[in-house]
Amino acid sequence: MAPVASRRVRRRVRSSKRPDARGRSAEDWWWDRLAPRGSGYHLLQADSMLLVLPDLEPPRARAHRRARRRAPRSLARGPTAVAKPRTKPRPEPSLDQGLDSGWGDRIPLEVLVHIFGLLVAAHGPMPFLGRAARVCRHWHEATSHPSLWHTVTLSPSLVGRAGKGNLKGEKKLLACLEWLVPNRFSQLQSLTLIHWKSQVHSVLELVSKFCPRLTFLKLSDCHTVTAETLVMLARACCQLHSLDLHHSMVESTAVVSFLEEAGSRMRKLWLTYSSQTTAILGALLDNCCPQLQVLQVSTGMNCNNTPLQLPVEALQKGCPQLQVLRLLNLIWLPKPCGRGVPQGPGFPSLEELCLAGSTCNFVSNEVLGRLLHRSPKLRMLDLRGCARVTPSGLCHLPCQELEQLYLGLYGISDGLTLAKDGSPLLTRKWYHTLRELDFSGQGFSEKDLEQALAVFSGTPGGLHPALCSLNLRGTRVTPSTVSSVISGCPGLLYLNLESCRCLPRGLKRVYRGLEEVQWCLEQLLTSPPSAKEPT
């Protein structure tokens, strides 16, 4: 079979005739047009195709070879002439020889580890450390430093079809981890597993044996996570205090067993809402995690329309140290409290409350008061989609140094009666600390917005306000109000004026950066009065 195959593909052999010879055929002319001499390409003819392929040899070496072949030979004069030995041409220095090949060895190991640490912090340890370890022994020693492997993300590559290919990729990566974990992960602190379907137990078993300093574990889109696996990890890693189960199929019994084992040291917990979330919240209400600081419950890819009934006062007693509470895109309602029941202990350490959602929710002034009546340290309040909350209810909150306030309504205010006044109550209370403000979709009148935003242009004492982000999308803000806000807030870096019906055409867009915001101010100040009429 080999001789037959060799006859099918052949390389075109050029004729020894000169290009300008009279006997040159049309075929030779086309071959020279497709692959001219010295172009670095040659032709390969098959049964039904013609391939133009690059030469494998470098052009410089080929030029030297042709120069030697074309050099005229010296004729011997007489019978005693002796042929002179052919001298090889002196090779030209290459680029690699011109550079100093030992510069990497002269860098101290501590400096090299620090440089690699900067790269790892920006892009992660893999695949950079694996490639750098092949450069030289000095670099291999630097990449093996355990401090460079404190944060690792492991995701098997998909080979072939999604089902069988993922299992093949998991087994291949697991074989590498059997050497990598005991030799590199001794100081591992943060581990993230993504898209693991069947080998989660094997990976976490290796981690429990060789990673005693693990503090954070994230399982994203992982399956077959059992209670035995999580309990084994909780017992082996005594410093583990953060667990992220966002978008993972984990049984509630496994999470409850883990919290019973490691709940006393838990600081952060991320959950995806499902029908089993109530059992996990029940463990939190029983004071299973008294030191919990961050709690996030959000919907997954498949939205669950079953409302979550949250006992607010019981959560305040079970998690008194809570600093961040996020209930994202949930349909939830607080458990009603009976008449004459005193208020709960509140969240005295709460700094961030996020109740944003894209659907109608049951958050009102009364619910907000039950959550924040004892939260003076609140810095961020996200109420996007909470159309039932009014400015009069917000101004009674005990927090005095709010920095981020989001009240945007994105497409859910249709058919609802929105407040047309009250925005000055918010800006007058928090103008000295507000850095980000979102009024998008609110129904405040032109005069009400003018009074509210005028606070940022006339701050007492000559101090500039801290406002750097302002979202007025879909509001009735006027050009004069916008220009006064920009003039009074020199640090404004984000301004959203989309769908503002009172602004002229050409200015209803998003402005990012100081230059774009100042350009908007120039257009408002220099445009004629006729152009400032609403369109």
Swiss-Prot record:
Would you tell me the Gene Ontology cellular component terms? Answer: SCF ubiquitin ligase complex
Q: Does the keyword Repeat apply?
A: yes
Q: Which domain of life is it from?
A: Eukaryota
Keyword Repressor appears in the UniProt entry: no
All disulfide bonds of the chain are none
UniProt keyword list = Leucine-rich repeat, Repeat, Ubl conjugation pathway
Family matches, as InterPro entries:
F-box-like_dom_sf, F-box_dom, FBXL6_F-box, Leu-rich_rpt_Cys-con_subtyp, LRR_dom_sf
F-box domain residues: 54-106
| LRR repeat windows | 169-195, 196-221, 222-247, 273-299, 304-329, 330-357, 360-385, 386-411, 415-441, 474-499
The record's section on SUPFAM superfamilies has: F-box domain (SSF81383), RNI-like (SSF52047)
Q: Which residues cross the membrane?
A: none
Q: Which Pfam families match?
A: F-box-like
Q: Where is the composition biased (Basic residues)?
A: 7-16, 61-72
The record's PANTHER family line, in alphabetical order, gives: F-BOX/TPR REPEAT PROTEIN POF3, F-BOX_LRR-REPEAT PROTEIN 6
Q: What is this protein called?
A: F-box/LRR-repeat protein 6
The organism encoding this protein is Mus musculus (Mouse)
